[in-house]
Design a protein with these regions (language model features):
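Amphipathic alpha-helical packing segments from all-alpha helical-bundle domains
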Residues: 59-85, 96-111, 126-137
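Residue-level recognition of alpha-helical structural elements
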Residues: 22-25, 29, 60, 91-95, ...
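Helical hydrophobic small-molecule/effector-binding pocket
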Residues: 27-51, 66-77
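Short, hydrophobic secondary-structure boundary micro-motifs
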Residues: 48-50, 62-63, 91, 147
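Short loop-to-helix capping motifs
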Residues: 43, 56-57
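Secondary-structure edge/capping motif, primarily at the C-terminal ends of alpha-helices
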Residues: 15-20, 47-54, 82-86, 109, ...
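An amphipathic alpha-helix adjacent to DNA-recognition modules
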Residues: 1-17, 30-34
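C-terminal peripheral helix-coil segments that are non-catalytic and often amphipathic
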Residues: 111, 115-158
């Protein structure tokens, strides 16, 4: 369990660091979220039983807390970047709440999908859409239109 979870952290950390390296647009964030969901899917055995693992394994507990904190901080950074560019209009408090909600949905979407359809394949695109739709009310102009376009093209295909 420890070695597998270490692999999960090693694969997640660089991904969570990447978005802050340059200004992000709607398509960049969509791609970032898709890659994040693919990583979560790869390590789904941890995510599906995370509550049980947290109570039984102190190493998993501390590492998962760091991963969650990093996810949330990355979401804050991305939203602040969008706000600085005028793409997103939100207060600091709204950005923090949005980042928390985005992190919650991204972290637990596949468990939700599994509970809805235990024998079906997860719909990663729909999960990405759910996370992005949280930001939709705050997006302005072209970013909002692009989100609607991506959502229509991607979610309706899957």
């Amino acid at each position: 369990v420890d070695a597998g979870f270490a692999d999960c952290g090693e694969e997640s950390e660089p991904l969570l660091t990447a978005p802050g390296s340059r200004p992000q647009g709607t398509e960049d964030i969509w791609l970032f979220l898709h890659l994040l969901f693919e990583t979560i899917w790869k390590f789904r055995f941890f995510y599906r039983d995370i509550n049980d693992l947290l109570t039984r394994n102190r190493l998993v507990e501390t590492h998962f807390q760091r991963i969650l904190e990093h996810k949330e901080n990355t979401a804050v950074t991305v939203c602040e970047g969008l706000a600085a560019s005028g793409t997103l209009t939100a207060t600091a408090g709204e950005i923090r709440a949005l980042a928390t909600n985005m992190s919650v949905v991204a972290t637990f979407w596949l468990s939700f999908e599994h509970a809805r359809r235990p024998r079906g394949e997860p719909d990663i695109g729909h999960g990405v859409y759910q996370v992005m739709s949280l930001a939709a009310p705050y997006l302005q102009g072209e970013a909002r239109r692009l989100l609607e376009k991506l959502s229509g093209e991607y979610v309706n295909k899957n």
